[in-house]
Amino acid sequence: CIRDRRLGTQIKSRRLKLLGIWLFHVLGKRYIGIFLDPVLACNFRCKMCYFSDEQKRKSLRGTLKYEEIEAIAGSLFHRALKLQVGCGAEPTLHKDLVKIIALGKRYNVPYVSLTTNGNLLTKELLAAAVKNGLDELTLSAHGFTRETYEYLMTNGKFDLFCKLLANVTEIKKQYPQFKLRINYTINNNNIEELSRIWEVVGDELDILQLRPIQKIGESEYRDFDLTNIHARYDAVLVPLIEECRRRHITCLAPNKQNIIVLEENEAEDNSIEKITYCLSLIHI
């Protein structure tokens, strides 16, 4: 899926992209990514997230029944290149998490991932998810010390994060193709802790995604200034990117010249993404 996305970015012609999508559609091929939030709730109140805003939380409620997810699967999963469970909330709060992952594999979705803070993910639950077809675990992390992790990820426990990483190591022995991704949102409080990643994460990391902080609604955290992150790029991010390359780890990071350019630029044409990525949430 990473290769497929990169191929899409290498093709610059919008018309050629649309032609390719049309051909995939008429030939019955897979061409969409599905991002599914089975429950609109979270056990964390991360300071950079809209779940730290009490008013926003009041509008985020509801759970998809498994039968409703089956209906979504029947309509869309046969077209999916990727199913990502969890994108704007915490999917491990759903009681049928493993069944949802298994449903993706029942429809032969090539790549099924789970995005989570991980604190509710026991070794038994993770093992069951991988056994039933989970290809990738994406863990959100906003710090690599207990102090910063628990400060930025309110309600989170650093010990549970570290325990989960140890469980991933054990599960990978049985399922070596299973992948671990870390999503790290960089701000002025945690940029220097990136140098500690290896002593915390160990040797099992497959993908590291680094994203400068952006405002995604109202949140408790208010420091969106990227000036220092830009200034520290060569000292902090470049060595990390090079170390990832040495370890054969995929590192997804912005270029220095783009560090202060918002990805959600209103002038950018995102029509291709709109027709190839399907977002499913529920409000009750």
What kind of region is each of these model predictions?
Residues 6-136, 147, 151, 163, ...:
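Conserved alpha-helical substructure of the radical SAM core
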Residues 1-5, 282-284:
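Conserved small/polar residues in nucleotide/adenosyl-binding loops
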Residues 1, 22-27, 266-267:
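Short boundary motifs at domain starts and secondary-structure transition points
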